[in-house]
Amino acid sequence: MTKILNLARLDRKLKRLPTVAKAEIKSAMEAAASEIVAMMKSLVPVDDGALRDSIGWTWGKAPKGSLAVAAVKSGMAGDLTLTIYAGNAEAYYARWVEFGTKRHENAGKFAGTQHPGTTARPFFYVSWRANKRSSKRLIRKGMRDAARKVATGG
């Protein structure tokens, strides 16, 4: 029969792992989101600054009227959902800047006139794709650090 030494101590460490891991992962997710948001703000075309100022991240769902880049959900807990977004009631045109518009005929006050369309000025998904790999790396590092911290008794 095999006897495991210090089983109670190991059990205590394993029980502490989820809380320590959650804090480390949350910190890593915040750092990754801040990097992505900073890149988005540097790439967005600026007229009056409303669109640039509307870019951000939040825990949970994006504010109403905004365009969400991605919602990153942790497999550990449902409360670790981080959403990166752009646009709000004032900067409602975020998706038009990101994807552009096609040529169309105006209606309303300027009915019958032609709008030439606008070219896409991507800032949103470009930033997400450029930082996706490093963000995952940061989160994995957070998990490793949490396991290491629990193992050393920290």
Regions found by a protein language model. Give the residues of each.
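Short, Lys/Arg-rich flexible segments
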Residues: 1-94, 99-154
